């Protein structure tokens, strides 16, 4: 399956062939030849949207295949048009990139690791393995918003193994095989499978 969200997180519509469709506990389970729907994972919620005339209500990855949960069936072999709920996706991209910026700055300054985070409609929560005073958070907020104002490029690459072994990065160092590294210059270098904005300015604002 071609995971189009790794080609570009800004793909909003696509066409693909229906490979399988079966009824399950959460509705119909559909796999495609390619998809731009991001499956829940790495702290980021799943995309929603439309496949043809059926609604995609959830997306998960199983055994390397992205499974789309829908409210109706689609014929196997049919070409179908997918449309991402872009407002939802872009908010997740802003939140995820903002979380990287904050987590990276806190790791740099205090050595604390992000041990969990949750993206919500109105707020994002991040858990660290250390205590931060309010003044510390205000300093991080100021630094993060300064870097947002700089509109820094955010990159996602798959380094070669020798390059990866020599790289200093946050999180998921136990991963083997191809590892995707998301970088914000001066802010964060982290292994991540999620979708991100192209530049820090698109995060908008960090506010504790």
Task: Annotate each PLM feature.
Residues 1-208:
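A glycine- and charged-residue-rich anion-binding loop/surface
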């Amino acid at each position: 399956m071609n995971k189009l969200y790794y080609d570009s997180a800004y793909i909003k519509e696509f066409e693909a062939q229906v490979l399988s469709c079966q009824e399950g506990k959460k509705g119909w389970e559909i796999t495609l030849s390619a998809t731009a729907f991001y499956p829940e994972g790495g702290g980021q919620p799943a995309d929603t949207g439309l496949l043809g005339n059926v609604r995609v209500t959830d997306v998960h990855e199983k055994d390397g295949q992205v499974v789309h949960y829908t409210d109706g069936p689609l014929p196997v072999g049919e070409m179908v048009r997918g449309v991402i709920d872009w407002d939802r996706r872009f908010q997740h991209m802003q939140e995820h990139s903002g979380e990287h910026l904050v987590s990276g700055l806190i790791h740099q300054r205090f050595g604390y690791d992000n041990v969990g985070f949750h993206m919500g409609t109105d707020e994002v929560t991040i858990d660290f393995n250390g205590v931060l005073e309010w003044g510390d958070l205000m300093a991080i907020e100021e630094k993060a918003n300064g870097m947002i104002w700089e509109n820094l490029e955010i990159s996602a690459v798959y380094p070669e193994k020798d390059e990866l072994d020599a790289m200093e990065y946050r999180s998921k160092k136990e991963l083997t095989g191809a590892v995707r590294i998301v970088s914000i210059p001066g802010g964060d270098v982290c292994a991540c499978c999620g979708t991100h904005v192209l530049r820090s300015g698109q995060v908008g604002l960090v506010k504790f």
